[in-house]
């Protein structure tokens, strides 16, 4: 796919990667992905939104160059500095040293460490605007969606919102637009998985952002990955709100006890601990032998639990993999504040 004019003077210049199957080591991408980039041309200015992953540099530069010479781009809006968004900034600055980078102060500090050179910059404050001929760019600082440096850009006259990772997916579609997606089941599967991995740990921040997005007049949402939303925007916003609203399904305080037991001793400890907690009254206790239990179900239970105890024997002085796997899936933003401890047997 080449470039696509989304609105008069506003173009998609991203790259598609149908063959990608693993992203950032931990995410599986059965539908590939896209590295979305956009160009806005006004009467006297050119704005580039995002760059592309370094491996796509040459083809991406060719696309941008077909709209405007690289050395005539005035502004680069960096919504977020993760390398899949900013991996080509260094090369872009070599080709266009006069380029002004527009980003949050946090993002500019990160970029200085990434490119190791000076550059012109505009450190955006929340609510700040940039007037460019007949276009107004409004900036919304939205930290932790999903990095602390993130912002959205609203192109007021075009009713377009550029949202970085929010509302995106690892889903490569040749038609670029959400209205061109024929496999809706696959698209929403990829969208939910992307949300769970990228945005899910920051649900409260997403809800804050949604409150600010809903009042906007929107005809298009342009994410950093996946199809451009030219249809179904209210449904996407409602779905994100539903996914981000945490409703604890537990009617009373709940303690989860995941454990593994090589010879039964740690299992006996788990049973005794569970009985002791139960005898206190008023607390639900759920035991899971992680050799047999569904790890995904247990991970979800841990999210809503008030407390948890991890049980494991030691082999060569170490806790065992099923328990380590649970701990690496926890994050202070979602699991912080819970009562927790560990137990086990050794010898």
Describe each region flagged by the PLM.
Residues 3-65, 152-155, 159-163, 266:
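Conserved beta-strand hairpin/beta-sheet module of binuclear metal-dependent hydrolase folds
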Residues 55-102:
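Active-site metal-binding motif and surrounding structural segment of the metallo-beta-lactamase
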Residues 218-252:
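Terminal amphipathic helices with adjacent charged low-complexity linkers/tails
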